[in-house]
Amino acid sequence: MQLKIMPKKKHLSAGGVPLILFLCQMISALDVPLDLVQPPTITQQSPKDYIIDPRENIVIQCEAKGKPPPSFSWTRNGTHFDIDKDPLVTMKPGSGTLVINIMSEGKAETYEGVYQCTARNERGAAVSNNIVVRPSRSPLWTKERLEPIVLQNGQSLVLPCRPPIGLPPAIIFWMDNSFQRLPQSERVSQGLNGDLYFSNVLPEDTREDYICYARFNHTQTIQQKQPISLKVISVDELNDTIAANLSDTEFYGAKSSKERPPTFLTPEGNESHKEELRGNVLSLECIAEGLPTPIIYWIKEDGMLPANRTFYRNFKKTLQITHVSEADSGNYQCIAKNALGAVHHTISVTVKAAPYWIVAPQNLVLSPGENGTLICRANGNPKPRISWLTNGVPIEIALDDPSRKIDGDTIIFSNVQESSSAVYQCNASNKYGYLLANAFVNVLAEPPRILTSANTLYQVIANRPALLDCAFFGSPMPTIEWFKGTKGSALHEDIYVLHDNGTLEIPVAQKDSTGTYTCVARNKLGMAKNEVHLEIKDPTRIIKQPEYAVVQRGSKVSFECRVKHDHTLIPTIMWLKDNGELPNDERFSTDKDHLVVSDVKDDDGGTYTCTANTTLDSASASAVLRVVAPTPTPAPIYDVPNPPFDLELTNQLDKSVQLTWTPGDDNNSPITKFIIEYEDAMHDAGLWRHQAEVSGTQTTAQLKLSPYVNYSFRVMAENSIGRSMPSEASEQYLTKAAEPDQNPMAVEGLGTEPDNLVITWKPLNGFQSNGPGLQYKVSWRQKDGDDEWTSVVVANVSKYIVSGTPTFVPYLIKVQALNDVGFAPEPAAVMGHSGEDLPMVAPGNVRVSVVNSTLAEVHWDPVPPKSVRGHLQGYRIYYWKTQSSSKRNRRHIEKKILTFQGTKTHGMLPGLQPYSHYALNVRVVNGKGEGPASTDRGFHTPEGVPSAPSSLKIVNPTLDSLTLEWDPPSHPNGILTEYILQYQPINSTHELGPLVDLKIPANKTRWTLKNLNFSTRYKFYFYAQTSVGPGSQITEEAITTVDEAGIPPPDVGAGKGKEEWRKEIVNGSRSFFGLKGLMPGTAYKVRVGAEGDSGFVSSEDVFETGPAMASRQVDIATQGWFIGLMCAVALLILILLIVCFIRRNKGGKYPVKEKEDAHADPEIQPMKEDDGTFGEYSDAEDHKPLKKGSRTPSDRTVKKEDSDDSLVDYGEGVNGQFNEDGSFIGQYSGKKEKEPAEGNESSEAPSPVNAMNSFV
């Protein structure tokens, strides 16, 4: 039994109150449980017009349900049908269905008639429709003799079919004797009556087997008419003989074969009438003849043809309108037209109507004492008559029921009792038919029960509707309540819809919709509940779509279709070609998500679709394969897509809108995706933000919107080349205002003064405001107190100052957004603090432990937390040197500060000065500043090693002594006990000699070293020492002089320079670098730095260049041996001049050759003039060159080697020869200038280096 639910009220509130549906007494599409007492209900019956196959048994159905089970009876032709008296008739057990056995004996025609079934129990009786039983008939065609038909080319023709009348009417079609359908066209077609019409005949119409067939579906038989022969001839073939032999009947020559305007073959005349019943298919037909073949047009004179229900059949010769109604009545005109004219025919259509329901009566379940109504409302043309029956008996003669009142098409029940239960029949009839409906009234008292299976699991794809069933029953009618979870969480009206039958609908199911839902049914007799479970699954999506492909014939192509799906659902991928199965060809192969087509052929071109199916959903994507010839083609020009256009907004809702667009040209590269941007003209005009992205195959997008935003949208397309220009903006769409859906972020509470609390937050922007009048509700209260919240509503600002607060007290703070529509959700409280003040108490019990001469450890006791009056940031130590134990360093030094974070109560003081007095104090620090200082605590550092002496200079160098001068260390770090001097010689190969140690009293600042080697370089190491040990050293180098006559070098010392640093960049792979252009006798500080990934590191050292050395050559111009030599040379020159003068005066020649050969001197070679006599008077005895200042050997012979060495030793080298005038080419010590033309010898003093080397 099905009951109708009519909602009276829906109730909804938050905070865990369930969604409640109040229902009255009518329940729709709901069965009364079969274990409850109920009147009969007809569940199955044969059709009203029941045509049977006479060769099979007759089965007349009648099934019903009820409690107790009903009994069945039949009437035939209005009288009781006693099945017990007819051995061929039986009734199925537990059923009212009749079976008439006519296959063994009997005839179907015997059982023709009108049958009606009645199902009855103690609560009432239900009746079936009147079932008209008729056997089907398929009579044979009457035998007839059909003469051949001969027509002139171009004449019209109608081949009659006229099948025998059968039941039901036969289906007509024309075929040849090979059972092939005859071709039809605008010229040749079959009419609705089965005749075959030729608008004009052609020679190709000639054939002898025009056969009309009639198919009778019920008997599955086909009847055949005798074949008709047709011959079409031309005018030339008509001669007198043929014409004489043909009768008028045989020769259809009434109409000329010349061209002619149309005339109608059917229907006849200019007007006709057609009547059709409402809901049927209206078929109008116009077939015309003419030459050329006419074309048919249809119009409705008083209106438009209904576009969705109008169809043209039979080459527009038949107009069909489906599901006709009274509104389709009117005049329809068909127009036949060819080149020679047109003809019209008007068909007047009247639509009548058999009865149809406006409100059919529904079963009614009432509890004792309740009221109810049965309504039976029908319409038709003509208007149907309504009559009531009760339990199959006209209500006028039925037993009277005081709870019942009839009012036309309505029966009103009041204060019903159990005896009021009955089955009522409503009959609506007119001349075109009738409607009969059964509806029971069942009076029950029954507590609620849930009919849906317990713990039913529903699985739904995300973002799709979810329908949770709660079929129920009870009397009185229960109220339905839905809870989420077993304890009942709130159901929001914009998320849930409760249907009349108790079904809960979630229009857009989300992941958070997953869970258990409880349905509760209640009435005054009790309650029942049921739990169902909902699982939300991820949708199946194709994340890699097959792509458009252009391949050459004979090549291979692959399509990929990658699917993303819910992990609990297993998809199956199916490939289709042009929406059909793939060809059964081994060239097509599929593997998981790939389709491969090998040896591509022309027929392989088309649309390939991959479909991923799961048990809950599916997804599809398509790509086009284009097959081209394997000849080279010009390369296409690829570019970014053209912008989309024709943007349109549809389905405009408060929080969503559908955007549709038309893609631009893809410029030979398929579009892979569309990017949608929006502009908020109200809050951020001119600023476009990202909204969504969709695949390149979509042209619509469902966009989620925010309240109170004036949206404009634009779309960009993207392919493998790049992104298109934006489309033109869409029309603007202003969404409705709503309360804010979020609160400000970054809420903080920090005081700036000891008596205030500054509450700050990041304001919402205009897009987040969701409506006009954005404000903030600021609330605060002390965290540890019982105070109520204090609140204030402020304008759209970002801070609020609370004054008069205690110092540094924790507060709970909330900032809630609101606008003219309402409040945002309740925000969570955050903790802040009122303003800080300076700490009140100094750390106590300060202790100092000296670790070594440069390090001390300080300990102190922490201050009480309340005295900090703020966030404890740490402790700060101030320390300073009050005085140094050394007399040299008793000067004021500024205080130094060390801060120790957090709650530490000790710390180390590094970098102290040894042998010094220090003082310190400790202070606590918070966000406001420092507290008072502790009592100063003094301490003393022990002695340490001293620093290097401040300077070191080498003064007054002599042949065997050097004097050192220095300044004491700048930081003695204790009492100096002595100085330590170490030195060692350095030879010409820079090797160091033995090291000599020397201790010097601490009160000295000058010291002379004696008994040193002359002209020797020494390296000195000098440092001071205390009782702790030696300090850093300072180094220096110096050279003793050659002799006392030398010019004393300048003082050499190591001190501080004033020059700026010079920088040289050196390749990182080198390990040395030469410094040039340094000053002699100067100390330099060298710093070498390296920079890499870990940072910059450096080291430095001090070195000193050597002193400028005085020349080790003695001034020979003042030496006695040199003066004597010069006198001898001058005398020799004078003698030579005298000899030359005498010889010239005498003009004689002297034999001096032998003498020259005997005493050949390589230094004095004969240099003859033209007469060959010059040089014969050169006497070796007169030339006495010196060898290192010694006398000539006793044998008075001068060797070449000695002479050469002598001259070279004096700096003249190979140029130390005589000129023609007897003078030296080279000069000693440069005392005499040379002539300009005399060689390249320099007139300057000899090199000090060469002079020094001559003495080594």
Swiss-Prot record:
Ranges of biased composition (kind: Polar residues): 1240-1256
Known glycosylation sites: 77, 217, 239, 245, 270, 308, 371, 427, 501, 613, 710, 796, 852, 987, 1003, 1013, 1067
GO molecular function term, any single one: protein binding involved in heterotypic cell-cell adhesion
Purpose: Cell adhesion protein that is required for normal responses to cell-cell contacts in brain and in the peripheral nervous system. Plays a role in neurite outgrowth in response to contactin binding. Plays a role in mediating cell-cell contacts between Schwann cells and axons. Plays a role in the formation and maintenance of the nodes of Ranvier on myelinated axons. Nodes of Ranvier contain clustered sodium channels that are crucial for the saltatory propagation of action potentials along myelinated axons. During development, nodes of Ranvier are formed by the fusion of two heminodes.
The species this protein was found in: Mus musculus
Tissue: Detected in sciatic nerve. Detected in brain, especially in the cerebellum Purkinje cell layer, inner granule cell layer and molecular layer (at protein level). Detected in neurons and Schwann cells.
Intrachain disulfide bonds: C62-C117, C161-C212, C286-C334, C376-C426, C470-C519, C561-C610
Record domain Ig-like C2-type: where: 40-128, 135-229, 261-350, 355-442, 448-535, 539-626
Name of the featured protein: Neuronal cell adhesion molecule
Subunit composition and interactions: Constituent of a NFASC/NRCAM/ankyrin-G complex. Detected in a complex with CNTN1 and PTPRB. Interacts with GLDN/gliomedin and MYOC.
Extracellular side: 30-1119
Record-linked PANTHER family: CTX-RELATED TYPE I TRANSMEMBRANE PROTEIN, NEURAL CELL ADHESION MOLECULE L1-LIKE PROTEIN
Family statement: Belongs to the immunoglobulin superfamily. L1/neurofascin/NgCAM family.
Domain of life: Eukaryota
Ranges in the topological domain labelled Cytoplasmic: 1143-1256
